[in-house]
């Protein structure tokens, strides 16, 4: 049984091998037919189109090309006449004819026959024919070369135009992308409005600085609708915790935002003004990257000692009432602004003065005694040069805590060499007024001396007040207001 099983398995294996071999033969047999049926592979056509210039035959080089062809044809004809084969039997037959018959044939033949009879088989034609043909071929080759050179020049010009057009297209696309990126970064897409809030002080400072020193006064317009005032008031309240009250409210007045004359003092103190810029800052210049110009370094007088211990809410409400009236200049054409006030003293550290009387005198004056110090107002009243001189040389006399009558100027203060002046810095484009009346002499207010007895604590406070440094952190500012009673600010 075992032997028969082995034989059966062997036979099955042999059958499998035979079937596999037969299949291989069947597959190999039609292979030559398939090889013959394979199509011949063709070269793929190039998709790149070669742009070339035209061969312009209507040109001087084309004229010389045609001339060379004609000269070469003439040379070929001359060579054919010189090397034309001769036939001797025709010549022998013609010699038998009489002289009279030959004369009649010559007269009837004409000029062409005479020419062929004279120059046929001549040595001149054998020599001049190839020479003229060579001259014609030379002219043809030179003209053809010039034509192809002109075509190559045209192709180069075409390629250069293509390159320039692609470069210009890429450059315009990059400019559009940069404008879009700058618009997304700065928020100034085209002529859209710039919203004023507590965190946009740097952009307002840059825009107003450009407008004041470059003559862009007409590019600004004020929008004083009720809805926008309410919206900006809400935004100012939401961002009021970022800045101290005096600094946040005085920054609006420093930026030169002044209301229309029909507004009352309550509208001025609202602080909700919206400034719109049109085509001042381009897409490539970001207002956030402009440097902040340091206009003034001054120490602001603190309120009275009795008011130091008041709550922060009362201090904020009081500072908001004084925010828009902080920077004022007396009107030059009115007589009311030059009336001396008995309770107002100039900024002089050598003379002692009452803190409470200063605060009450600043609150006593109304808004009609002066005008906000803005680029447009200064330009209307005094001109561009005098407004710059006003902002630069008398920056020490500006008090952000006082009323309109506190802006006093003295000759010693104007000539002090240590104070910053714009005409000593990079204020190019403005000429200093010479041999003319100084407009700052109109702002002189007579000094009124008030005698009062002070305690030792008040004297120490006044002495320490004159030597305080400017603080640039809001937390220290608030703590110093509550503890020492000093208020510092920065622009």
From Swiss-Prot:
The keyword Transmembrane helix applies. It is found in: Membrane. Its main location: membrane. The chain crosses the membrane at residues 62-82, 127-147. InterPro entries: DUF2371_TMEM200. Residues 16-41 are annotated as: Disordered. Keywords: Glycoprotein, Membrane, Phosphoprotein, Transmembrane, Transmembrane helix. Residues 1-61, 148-491 are cytoplasmic. It comes from the Eukaryota. Residues 83-126 are extracellular. Expressed in cerebellum. It holds the Pfam family DUF2371. Residues 20-34 have a biased composition (Polar residues). It is a multi-pass membrane protein. The modification Phosphoserine is found at residue 350. GO terms for cellular component: membrane. Glycans are attached at residue 100. Belongs to the TMEM200 family. This is Transmembrane protein 200A. It comes from Homo sapiens (Human). The lineage of its organism: Eukaryota, Metazoa, Chordata, Craniata, Vertebrata.
């Amino acid at each position: 049984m075992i032997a028969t099983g082995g034989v059966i398995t062997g036979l099955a294996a042999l059958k499998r091998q035979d079937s596999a071999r037969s299949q291989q033969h069947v597959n190999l047999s039609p292979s030559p037919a398939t090889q013959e049926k394979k199509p011949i592979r063709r070269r793929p056509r190039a998709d790149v189109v070669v742009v070339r210039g035209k061969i312009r035959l209507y040109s001087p080089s084309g004229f010389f090309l045609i001339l060379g062809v004609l000269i070469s044809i003439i040379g070929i004809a001359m060579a054919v006449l010189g090397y034309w084969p001769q036939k001797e039997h025709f010549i022998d037959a013609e010699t038998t004819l009489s002289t009279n018959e030959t004369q009649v044939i010559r007269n009837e033949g004409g000029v062409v026959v005479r020419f062929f009879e004279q120059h046929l088989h001549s040595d001149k034609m054998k020599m001049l024919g190839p020479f003229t043909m060579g001259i014609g071929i030379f002219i043809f080759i030179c003209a053809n070369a010039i034509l192809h050179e002109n075509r190559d020049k045209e192709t180069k010009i075409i390629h250069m135009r293509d390159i320039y057009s692609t470069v210009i297209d890429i450059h315009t696309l990059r400019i559009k992308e940069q404008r879009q990126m700058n618009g997304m970064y700065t928020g100034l897409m085209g002529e859209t409005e710039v919203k004023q809030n507590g965190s946009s002080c740097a952009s307002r400072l840059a825009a107003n600085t450009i407008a004041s020193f470059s003559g862009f006064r007409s590019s600004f317009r004020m929008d004083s609708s009720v809805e926008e005032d309410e919206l900006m008031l809400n935004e100012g309240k939401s961002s009021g915790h970022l800045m101290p009250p005096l600094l946040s409210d005085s920054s609006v007045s420093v930026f030169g935002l002044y209301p229309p004359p029909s507004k009352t003092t309550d509208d001025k103190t609202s602080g909700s003004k919206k400034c719109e810029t049109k085509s001042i800052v381009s897409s490539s210049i970001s207002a956030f990257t402009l440097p902040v110009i340091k206009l003034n370094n001054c120490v602001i007088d603190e309120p009275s000692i009795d008011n130091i211990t008041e709550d922060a809410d009362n201090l904020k409400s009081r500072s908001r009432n004084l925010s828009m009236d902080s920077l004022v200049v007396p009107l030059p054409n009115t007589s009311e602004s030059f009336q001396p006030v008995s309770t107002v003293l100039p900024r002089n550290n050598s003379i002692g003065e009452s803190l409470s009387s200063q605060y009450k005198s600043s609150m006593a004056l109304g808004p009609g005694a002066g005008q906000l110090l803005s680029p447009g107002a200064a330009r209307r009243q005094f001109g561009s040069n005098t407004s710059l001189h006003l902002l630069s040389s008398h920056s020490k006399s500006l008090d952000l805590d006082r009323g309109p009558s506190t802006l006093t100027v003295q000759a010693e203060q104007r000539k002090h060499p240590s104070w910053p002046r714009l005409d000593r810095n990079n204020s190019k484009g403005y000429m200093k007024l010479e041999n003319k009346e100084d407009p700052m002499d109109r702002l002189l207010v007579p000094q009124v001396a008030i005698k009062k007895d002070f305690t030792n604590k008040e004297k120490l406070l006044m002495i320490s007040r004159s030597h305080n440094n400017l603080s640039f952190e809001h937390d220290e500012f608030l703590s110093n207001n509550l503890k020492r009673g000093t208020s510092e600010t920065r622009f």
